[in-house]
Amino acid sequence: MASYPDGQSYPGAAGQVPGPHPGGYYPGPPHGGGQYGSGFPPGGYGAPAPGGPYGYPSAGGTPSGTPGGPYGGGPPGGPYGGGPPGGPYGQAHPSPYGTQPPGPYGQGGVPPNVDPEAYSWFQSVDADHSGYISLKELKQALVNSNWSSFNDETCLMMINMFDKTKTGRIDVVGFSALWKFLQQWKNLFQQYDRDHSGSISSTELQQALSQMGYNLSPQFTQLLVSRYCTRSAIPAMQLDCFIKVCTQLQVLTEAFREKDTAVQGNIRLSFEDFVTMTASRML
């Protein structure tokens, strides 16, 4: 029997993790294998959202970040509009792409439902001017605070989440949604990086997961950090692994919640059901 004590390990109203725009970018099996589920409850990081059983966040409004809002302005100096590369969080590689290329985007301006700043970066990251962002292009565009590239697992996970065409690539609309997703995770990462080191320690991760509504032991949190941390004297987690871990926890929580039809915080599964549930959700 799998169980969450009193249902308290469900992400609660203390905060919602970033997810795709309602309507979703993973309605079916993603490119690369597996099923990424039905999506996460949309939400931001302000006041607590009304919760369902166990404080699980119910679907609400989309996070802030519409065109003309915090993303607006001219071409960004970094992938999150935070000035030129050199800051600690998720900055792009020093301009391997140069100026915005002409190509298949036309001259009609920013497409509908696409953030202007995300559109500028889409044009820069789309190195082959194909009109799509590949796994390789996405990986080349994103780095951690220690200037390491985002790992393949996280990049593939994000491609799978926002690939509407199921071809292993992201179009401009999907990239705009991914842009917002990354912006939210970067903000959350900065919030919990309390010592401003550019990485998340096991203590900081424990605090982050607790405020997201998870009731997980320090031993489990230390296991996550040791599994996904950088090789250093003091184990710590970079932005890419933070995104991967928190997103996967949310996916598995949703899988558990679907089986917990009695809303009791525990379920009984056969071994094959457990393996199937896990394998179908893991990327």
Swiss-Prot record:
Keywords: Calcium, Cytoplasm, Cytoplasmic vesicle, Endoplasmic reticulum, Membrane, Metal-binding, Repeat, Ubl conjugation. Residues 21-108 are annotated as: 9 X 9 AA approximate tandem repeat of [AP]-P-G-G-P-Y-G-G-P-P. Coiled coil: none annotated. It is a peripheral membrane protein. CDD domains: EFh_PEF_peflin (cd16184). Ubiquitinated by the BCR(KLHL12) E3 ubiquitin ligase complex. Sequence repeats lie at residues 21-29, 31-39, 41-48, 49-58, 59-67, 75-83, 84-91, 92-99, 100-108. Residues 31-44, 62-84 have a biased composition (Gly residues). Residues 203-283 are annotated as: Required for interaction with PDCD6. Ca(2+) 1 binds at residues 126, 128, 130, 132, 137. This is Peflin. The gene is Pef1.
